[in-house]
From Swiss-Prot:
GO biological process: neuron differentiation; regulation of transcription by RNA polymerase II
Protein name listed in UniProt: Homeobox protein ceh-31
Tissue: Expressed in PVR neurons.
Organism this protein belongs to: Caenorhabditis elegans
A Pfam family the protein falls into: Homeodomain
Keywords: Developmental protein, DNA-binding, Homeobox, Nucleus
Gene, per the UniProt record: ceh-31
Length: 260
């Protein structure tokens, strides 16, 4: 047990003077002296009284001093968001601007496509140079146009494979630009009668009557066998003849013979 310092009781004013306390602190090796220390014997003998009176900085106080809006350092969510942000930005590709063709360019492209469905590299480069376009633009337009052309051609074959779709086939020939243009360009395959094309002896197609090849030639051959004209229309109605008119005609003819 450490001995009591009697000077604390004999000269209390020495310890209450701040100047003397600072001098004593420097002479004792920088040891801290609590200004609020009590002079009770229990407090003087307890070595933990000095440490408990001074609040130590704790991690809780440090964290509370930080701004609540600032993210915590080392947080798993923060690290994951930081790592994923460059990936999300890199995976987003810039969308290419769509090419806008003029009416003249579209007309020339359509005319060229009607003559030649597939272009060689040399022909494509010449066409692009003549129209003021790039080779890639002409190539992309031809690919899209061929896709549309094949889709329109397949629609007619799908309808012909269904025996109950003859009305839909007639509507297709009237409205579908692909088949309308194709049939108008091949009018030599079909006959004409008084400029009023009709269906003569119309036969509803069945699956056995349709060629297996899915091409426009097979469709045209089937339509030619049914005597389809380039413009579908309803047949003319023949003039109606009643029995009374036939009887009157025979009577008038008999009277004319008797007069002779």
């Amino acid at each position: 047990m450490s001995m009591l310092d009697l000077r604390q009781f004999l000269i209390p004013a020495f310890f209450l003077d701040p100047t003397n306390q600072l001098a004593a602190q420097s002479s004792s090796g920088g040891a801290k002296i609590n200004l609020n220390s009590s002079f009770r014997i229990s407090d003087l003998l307890d070595p933990t009284s000095h440490s408990t009176n001074e609040p130590d900085p704790s991690p809780t106080s440090i964290n509370s001093s930080e701004s609540p809006s600032s993210p915590r350092i080392g947080s798993p969510n923060t690290e994951r968001s930081v790592n994923e942000s460059p990936t999300c930005v890199g995976s987003k590709k810039a969308r290419k601007a769509r090419t806008i063709f003029t009416d003249k360019q579209l007309q020339e492209l359509e005319n060229t496509f009607e003559k030649q469905k597939y272009l060689s590299v040399q022909d494509r480069m010449e066409l692009a140079h003549r129209m003021g376009l790039t080779d890639t633009q002409v190539k992309t337009w031809y690919q899209n146009r061929r896709t549309k052309w094949k889709r329109q051609a397949s629609v007619g074959m799908d309808l012909l494979h269904d025996a109950g779709n003859m009305a839909a086939v007639q509507q297709l020939l009237r409205t579908n630009p692909y088949w309308a243009n194709y049939l108008s360009q091949n009018t030599s395959m079909f006959g004409a009668s008084n400029n009023r094309p009709v269906f003569n002896s119309l036969v509803v197609p069945t699956s056995s009557m349709i060629p297996a090849s899915n091409s426009q030639n097979s469709l045209l051959q089937f339509l030619a066998s049914q005597n389809v004209k380039d413009d579908i229309s309803s047949p003319k109605e023949s003039p109606s003849v009643s029995p009374d008119s036939v009887k009157n005609a025979s009577v008038s003819k008999k009277e004319s013979d008797e007069d002779e």
